[in-house]
């Protein structure tokens, strides 16, 4: 990650064309959530079980850099106001969560530039490296995002690529930046023009936490996710969603 840069304070929703606003994925209950910070560009110190707000910005890769240095999307020096799209999430700290960005079609996010950056905080301005989401040829639908905390303060965010062994040899898939990617023409709304594809290519982000909370309790979900990788949690949740949708469709 680039050297830590102090971000210019700014309310995140004002910095983007906000087309995506998602509810909390794991639903930290009000009575169990001790974190009262809901702004992704503000600093928070959390315990296990608290809610934690972060954002994901979608734009071209170069839009996240200024003078060759990657900045937080909260930083007003980045030219994101009229081009980027934003998703906001509030998962529960140290719970395994799968978040879905409910884009209207594959082209909805690729038209923003095809890359995404996760971010949170102001003092440390934690941000992930830009990761490829999609273009007119291929779209990645499964991601793993790791939060690294120290005494309850977010220090780092990074994407963990799973490699391409699971899609090797499949006609509708390719390997892009060490991740399996489906042909965008197979997606609903493929190529940004409401294509004929039938696959829901909305990005799914699996979360994991590492480090320590503000009480110095160890966050273990990254270890749990790494051990469960062989079972493909993203595939498990996707299959469950498809199964439930199929069962409900039988009632109509």
Give the label of every model feature segment.
Residues 2-16, 20-252:
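Typically disulfide-stabilized, N-glycosylated extracellular/lumenal ectodomains of secreted
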């Amino acid at each position: 990650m680039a050297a830590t840069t102090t971000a210019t304070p700014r309310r995140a929703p004002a910095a983007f064309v906000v087309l995506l606003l998602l509810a909390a994925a794991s639903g930290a209950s009000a009575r169990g959530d001790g974190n009262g910070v809901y702004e992704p560009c503000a600093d928070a110190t959390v315990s296990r079980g608290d809610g934690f707000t972060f954002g994901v910005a979608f734009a071209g890769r170069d839009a996240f850099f200024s003078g060759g240095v990657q900045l937080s999307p909260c930083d007003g020096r980045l030219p994101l106001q009229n081009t980027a799209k934003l998703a906001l999430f509030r998962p529960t700290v140290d719970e395994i969560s799968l978040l879905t960005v409910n884009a209207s079609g594959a082209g909805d996010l690729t038209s923003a530039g095809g890359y995404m950056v996760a971010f949170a905080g102001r003092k440390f301005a934690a941000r992930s490296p830009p990761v490829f989401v999609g273009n007119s040829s291929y779209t990645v639908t499964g991601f793993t995002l790791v939060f690294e905390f120290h005494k309850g303060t977010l220090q780092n965010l990074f994407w963990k690529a799973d490699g391409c062994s699971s899609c090797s040899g499949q006609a509708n898939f390719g390997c892009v930046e060490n991740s399996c990617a489906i042909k965008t023409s197979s997606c609903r709304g493929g190529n940004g023009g409401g294509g004929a594809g039938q696959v829901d290519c909305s990005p799914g982000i699996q979360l994991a936490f590492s480090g320590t909370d503000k009480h110095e309790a160890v966050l273990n979900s990254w270890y749990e996710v790494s051990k469960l990788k062989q079972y493909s949690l993203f595939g498990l949740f996707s299959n469950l969603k498809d199964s439930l949708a199929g069962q409900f469709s039988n009632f109509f």
